[in-house]
Each structure stands twice: as structure tokens, then as C-alpha cells.
Design a protein with these regions (language model features):
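Beta-hairpin (beta-strand-turn-beta-strand) motif
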Residues: 57-59, 85-89, 134
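A short, Lys/Arg-enriched interface patch at domain edges and termini
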Residues: 53-63
Length: 137
């Protein structure tokens, strides 16, 4: 396993992107991605090897993948998840689920940005963890 990115929820994605750009980060993608199924807007920024995924509700009046996390804090920006690259997502998920420490938050599905497979598990102490399996060429 290798760390891929840190996912943060924010109430104002434009202001948060600007703050990171002023700190020397660069945009990974040219535009904010609107992910309709999860009612969220996403942008990735990076500095060296560090990638931060910024997520904000697209419509605050509707349920959102990140909206519930934002309701638990008065901060405008909060850690949402950790993300790891894995070689075999099915084996990783099965092995971790067998420990009894994880629950499935979202089953294996296609990723938003790349043609990869992702899965979200919830660890009882760590919280939400995303796993990426990159396409085999």
C-alpha cells in the first residue's frame, strides 16, 4: 500500500483552492469536477508528491457525500478520508474486512477522475479510508 492522497471536505471549494495555490500548490486538473451521483464538487491540488483532494457539496440543500462531515464541525475545512493505492482492491478489501475492524462504507466502484476502481471502508478508530486500484496495462 502507498498513500495516494488526503481528502478534505470544505464549505467553499473556490476559496480553499485559492488558499492552497497561495501556499505553492498547483491544480492537478484544470477545472472543478462536478460528481452528480454524490452531489459534490471535487478538485485536486498538489505540492511535490502530496496530493490533497478538496470536496464540497454541490447543492447544500441536498444530501452529499461530504455534507454530513461538514455538519460535525464549525471549521470550514475538515479531514474527510485517507486514500491508498493498492495492487488488488478485492484482496485488500477482503483481507481488511476479515480483521473485523472495518465496515464497508461504499462498495467497489469506478473512480471519478481516472479509469480506476475505488472502495471506501470505515475503520472504527481511523475513520474513512479510500482504496485505489489503478488499471493494469
Amino acid at each position: 500500500m502507498k498513500m495516494n492522497h488526503l481528502g478534505y471536505a470544505t464549505n467553499n471549494i473556490e476559496e480553499t483552492i485559492s488558499a492552497f495555490l497561495r501556499l505553492g500548490f498547483i491544480k492537478v486538473h484544470p477545472e472543478i469536477k462536478h460528481h452528480v451521483p454524490k452531489n459534490m464538487r471535487i478538485m485536486r491540488v498538489k505540492l511535490g508528491d502530496l496530493i490533497i483532494e478538496l470536496m464540497a457539496p454541490a447543492d447544500a440543500s441536498k444530501p452529499s457525500f461530504v455534507g454530513e462531515k461538514l455538519k460535525t464541525t464549525t471549521e470550514p475545512f475538515v479531514l474527510h478520508h485517507l486514500c491508498y493505492d493498492v495492487d488488488d482492491i478485492h484482496k485488500t478489501v477482503n483481507d481488511l474486512m476479515a480483521t473485523g475492524e472495518y465496515g464497508i462504507h461504499e462498495p467497489i466502484t469506478d473512480g471519478v477522475f481516472q479509469k480506476n476502481q475505488i472502495c471506501f471502508l470505515r475503520h472504527r478508530q481511523i475513520g474513512l479510508i479510500e482504496f485505489f486500484e489503478w488499471p493494469k496495462n
